[in-house]
Amino acid sequence: MTEQTQDENKLIAERRAKLEHIRTNCPANGHPNNFDRKHKAADIQAEFGHNTKEELEGMGIERSIAGRVMAKRGPFLVIQDVSGRIQAYAGKDVQKDLKEKFLGLDIGDIIGVTGQLHLSGKGDLYVNMEEYQLLTKALRPLPEKFHGLTDQETRYRQRYVDLIVNEDSREAFIMRSKVVSAIRNFMVKKEFMEVETPMMHSIPGGASARPFETHHNALDIAMYLRIAPELYLKRLVVGGFERVFEINRNFRNEGLSPRHNPEFTMMEFYMAYADFNDLMDLTEEMLSSIATELCGSPQLPYGEHTVDFGGPYARLSMLDAIKKYNPDNATIQSMTYEEVKDVEFMRDLAKSLGMTVEKFWTCGQLLEEIFGETAETQLMQPTFITGYPADISPLARRNDDNHFITDRFEFFIGGREVANGFSELNDAEDQDSRFKAQVDAKDAGDDEAMFYDADYITALEHGLPPTAGQGIGIDRLVMLFTNTHTIRDVILFPAMRPQAN
């Protein structure tokens, strides 16, 4: 046991002893639930922060606050609520009473205070403690500071502690809530209907990913947590709902990284009588308006860069992007789609770039992997990458001029993918063939290949109108709006490896 742990255990024991005293001498077993908090710290600061000491004394303003004790400075307590901080003043008689009733207050305790509002000699607003209650006794002490790797782990494992002591974390999650609300409002104004589709699927589909598997006892069948809502949302478009969207969780049984969490939030939407160009236009409008609404400007700081959401956004094909960011590679500079279709040529090119090549990779997979290896991280400004090969886009419509590629894009900012969209494949027979190719790929060892979904083929046979659809990764988007560089900083309770003990 470390010295720090011994000290913490001693403090916890002291606080437990105080709680026993409180239970004996205070009503409600030391946990009252009848305090009427009427005011918030930030509202008080905004309304009276400009008044002088004399003005406040003449006004006789009474305020009722509640929150957590974050600091003790002589007779002053710093009280924190959801909106901010304000001080409370405990005179000598109050301090004596606090000692008798509660054996004194500790940092972390939650209290309610009612009294006159005053201004201290240092110019800080405070509420005089005329009426007060200890609402919750904190048994564990708060950490003094968060720094270093160990404390990073604590931030994620004990997010409740992080939110108490770390204002930046609180602000990040407040911004997350605002981003989600702004997206929802934007979609509703564009006449999209919000829907909810199943979270458990009998056949996982809508993306290339490993699913989480479970078992439904009553039906005695295997079920999968959804990897994407796409196929259900398109069934709704078949049914006549021409504009639908869903903001919800997806689950993918894959690794952890600064960009990946096994459960994550997506906003996925579909619009009939539109194509992938319409999606790109809508995405520009959405992100530009949301950035301006929430941040006052379409230009946001991100690390050493400034990301400009104002538009227009760059648009280039995957092949052109590879050429752009490999200017000194003669083979890449002269590469054509005919060569991209040659799997041996692509395998040799990937190996020449120092890449490890899986035996089941197709031409399209090789092109995408080369793009990811050499170009993706260069895309700091908002950029639409188009020209995705059909063999890695099993749900997207083929391009009319070049059947090797599809009318699909992925949207990149800050060197990472944030969204994926395309003109939907509504040819039931073509979709049937592509599903079968995915089954063959799975048999060849690609465990992220899709399953065959016969009911979805049946839905397409009823007729899907020309449709475009897109998914936006909410977590990665929020990372940009909060200038954070790991997905764990924008997910309240991220997945963590089990602790040794």
From Swiss-Prot:
GO terms for cellular component: cytosol. Its cofactor is Mg(2+). It is found in: Cytoplasm. Keywords: Aminoacyl-tRNA synthetase, ATP-binding, Cytoplasm, Ligase, Magnesium, Metal-binding, Nucleotide-binding, Protein biosynthesis. GO terms for biological process: lysyl-tRNA aminoacylation. The keyword Mitochondrion does not apply. This is Lysine--tRNA ligase. It comes from Shewanella pealeana (strain ATCC 700345 / ANG-SQ1).
